[in-house]
Amino acid sequence: MYNEGVTSPSQLARKKNATDKWHGSSIRKILENPHYTGTLQQCREYRPSVTSKRRRSVNLENQIIIEKSHEPIIPLEDFLIVQEILITRKRRRPQAEVHLFTNTAVCKDCRRSMHFKKNRKGYVCGSYNKHGLKACSDHYVSEIDLTDKVITNLNKIYLKFSKENYFKELSEKALKYKEKIESKIIEINEKLNDKKRDKSNLVISLANGVISKEDYQLAINITNEDISNFETTLHQLSKDLEFQKIEKEIIDFKKSLDKFMKEGTLTPEMLHLLVDEIEVHANGTIEINYRFREPTVPSA
């Protein structure tokens, strides 16, 4: 129904978080609703309290049921056949099998988690798996390839960590960038304060009749834009400054990496200690974001 462009129930109800996608639970509720057979069935659910948002089901004997209360859309016989089919298809969900990259691998394009497909021995985009090509492409990557790439990358990082003076170089690089960012923050703060003074002077000039309203409006718009740009730059610089505080991050990552090299096995627990996220592109290539970050050049 999503692929055919049929309006979803949430869109029809104009909900704030409405989506164009149909979900299995919505379809099931429609199939199980006797209202379409001409039967009025009321008091099917209730709320335990006025403050509760959760609904609970009411036993059938306590519901109000009025048959042939309105014109049916579907015959009762068809409805009963559907109920029998639903019962035969109903099955207990097996305990969810945890795969190595569950909750770690994500689709680069739609940001949904990758789902493991046993028949393909790999992962596909969650949006594609649930809603098809209209939602996203499959972004398929095999579990073996993904494991090999992660292990290869971890081995490269381990060799880098093993180099003499590597930690010292990282600390010096972080300190260098930190000082550069702090200097830039002081510079931008001075410019921001100058612009705020200019804004105050414009207000005084307008009040004293030194400038016209038109000139004031033109000047104040430019000044406000400059102030906004400086504030945005300061916010980004503050984030960059926080990014340089990596010493503890490096130590924790190194401990986990040493443990992995000693054990030689990539388990889900070990993966989550080392890897923050794996982004899978449409062509199957990957980007690995580790829980360790090298100091980076300031963005501003």
UniProtKB/Swiss-Prot annotation:
PROSITE patterns the UniProt entry points to: RECOMBINASE_DNA_BIND
Q: Which residues form a coiled coil?
A: 162-249
Segments of the chain annotated as binding DNA: 1-92
> Out of the domains of life, which is the source?
Bacteria
- Gene Ontology molecular functions: DNA binding; DNA strand exchange activity
Instruction: Note down the stretches annotated as region Disordered.
Output: 1-20
Biased composition range(s): Polar residues: 1-11
Disulfide-bond pairs as recorded: none
User: Which positions, given as ranges, span the membrane?
Assistant: none
Q: Supply the alphabetized keyword list.
A: Coiled coil, DNA-binding
Q: Which Gene3D superfamilies match?
A: Putative Large Serine Recombinase, Chain B, Domain 2
Protein name, as recorded: Uncharacterized protein YefB
Q: What organism is listed for this UniProt entry?
A: Bacillus subtilis (strain 168)
Recorded name of the encoding gene: yefB
